[in-house]
Amino acid sequence: SRGLGDVYKRQCHNYDAMDHAKQHPEAARQMKVAAKDNQSCIDCHKGIAHQLPDMSSGFRKQFDELRASANGSGDTLYSIDIKPIYAAKGDKEASGSLLPASEVKVLKRDGDWLQIEITGWTESAGRQRVLTQFPGKRIFVASIRGDVQQQVKTLEKTTVADTDTEWSKLQATAWMKKGDMVNDIKPIWAYADSLYNGTCNQCHGAPEISHFDANGWIGTLNGMIGFTSLDKREERTLLKYLQMNASDTAGKAHGDKKEEK
């Protein structure tokens, strides 16, 4: 409960005593909003806000085990790392990247190569180089360029009411090398949960994931990432996990067809 624990926290962390100029810009922004609404510390920071042991060895061992047990069989696969994608089998220069925890359909297997199909959303009026999980939400699936981008198919379009912008659902075909792909998303989310609890508990109690929406998690995590030792892959995986379980996406399955109109 927030009662007694929050009383103890506010003895040390009184809003009036805070010097926002000495805080990280994102932390200062969040604290100003919390102070205005007189939010409880535990609304964002559950648990004890004291230094906890470094848990990085635990989640890094978990990733090594995930990579070692990776099963790339099946028609639907999920990435565990940032993977380059190519316009043609054997190309030396990449035509984009597949981001962690992203779904692909396998069209063909040829030696060490897979031909894949990637589906995602992009702003119709934009450069259409980034595919996202849902329209209007910056949950990144892949970046595309060159021949991969030139040969995309448009499946449907929708208008996001909040911003009155049109988004297009695109389908891209590309090639990638085998490896670092699994046929079940659940082990990736289990690893990402360990990332979250092992990293975000180092400075404070990890906030409830549903406290922020998918786009809000980008700025929130950026404000904290400088205090961690996460590499780019870990950061991307963690962000995807938080966004897929945010206040406006929680419960949506990977590849859910019921995108918000």
Where are these regions (language model features)?
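SH3/SH3-like beta-barrel fold
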Residues: A101, W113-G120
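SH3-family beta-barrel domains
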Residues: D54-K89, G96-L99, L107-D110, R129, ...
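Conserved, compact domain cores that house catalytic/ligand-binding motifs in diverse enzymes
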Residues: V182-D231
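Primarily the internal scaffold of c-type cytochrome electron-transfer domains
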Residues: M18-G74, A214-Q243, S247-D248, H254-G255
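Short, small-residue-biased leader/transition segments that mark boundaries at the very start
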Residues: G3-Y8
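The canonical Cys-X-X-Cys-His
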Residues: K9-Y15, Q39-G47, Y196-P207, L238, ...
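Short, intrinsically disordered, charge-biased short linear motifs at domain edges
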Residues: S1-R2, P25-K32, N183-Y191
